[in-house]
Amino acid sequence: DDNDFTNSWLQNRIQTKLYGKHRIKHELKLKGIADDMIDEHLDAHSSDDNEYARAFKLAQGKVGSFEGSDAQRSQRRLSQFLMRRGYSSAIAYRVCKDIFDES
């Protein structure tokens, strides 16, 4: 049923793909899942802290590919990458700030 499918799809996208809420919600809508069911499952599986942690982990793996670029360009590219993966602009900005402040 839709409930089980939504749950397993969410688990897969969160744990293996490290997708953000926006991307997951979009994919589930394309599969024909109702908005209220999507929101219910997303709220149960993903908090803002978890979302930030996943985005940070994803960014750490990606940031090495930007070596040699100037910092501003690298930050912009990383931010755009995170937003394409479904993270909000606020989380993408926070992750980029934290990653590039570490350097």
Kindly give the residue locations of the regions a language model identified.
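An alpha-helical, amphipathic repeat domain used for nucleic-acid recognition
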Residues: 1-103
